[in-house]
Amino acid sequence: NERIGSVGKVLGNRIVRISKDGEIENKNMDLPHYLENTAGLTSNLTSTPSSAECEWLPTGDLGHLDDDGFLYLDGRKKNVLITSFGRNISPEWPESLLLGSGLFRQAMVIGDGQAQLGALLVTAKEGLSDEVIQAGVTSANQELPDYAQIKHWLLADEPFSPNNGLATANGRLKRDLIKKKFNDQIELLYANT
């Protein structure tokens, strides 16, 4: 019962739905019971949500279910980029293709409010030529529709790590801090287009 690209089927004791905006929501059957039994802990709330309001909990993840009930994660809601054409793109999609090439150790797709996407790249090996890097980007782009292709890229001068504050301890990119650190280079990247 596996399907390539999916995280599997939803466990039998859980109910999942996809909201109108694509967010995965989990039905918490235990929440009304929890609220009843923790009234003292929640007494400072100005209003206690009804059980109907509490049952569906947003996860912050975007995803979809296929016809056979397999769940696919498409990215994090807070990471969605909206291009100047109004296209919503989960950056994790092109990032996963870039990382899958083996040429890149890290990739962060940028382009919120822009006509085209770009990427900040950390190569897996030092000294790769621009031609090799572009070939990796081109290869990833072949699997993407035009609106999600990487049209511009730049190399980061160091990996994104907890030591420099650009990643969490478990390796998640701190996107806002990375954008801030590379703001001048990103502006130049888009100024030349």
Predicted regions and their residues:
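Flexible lysine-rich "adenylation lid" loop at the C-terminal edge of ANL adenylation domains
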Residues: 156-182
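Short loop/turn motifs at secondary-structure junctions and domain boundaries
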Residues: 7-10, 54-55, 155-158, 182
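Gly/Ser/Thr-rich phosphate-binding loop
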Residues: 1-2, 105
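Conserved ATP-binding/catalytic segment of the ANL
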Residues: 10, 17-83, 100
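Acidic/polar alpha-helix N-cap and adjacent early helical turns
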Residues: 182-193
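AMP-binding/adenylate-forming catalytic core of the ANL superfamily
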Residues: 18, 62-152, 159, 164
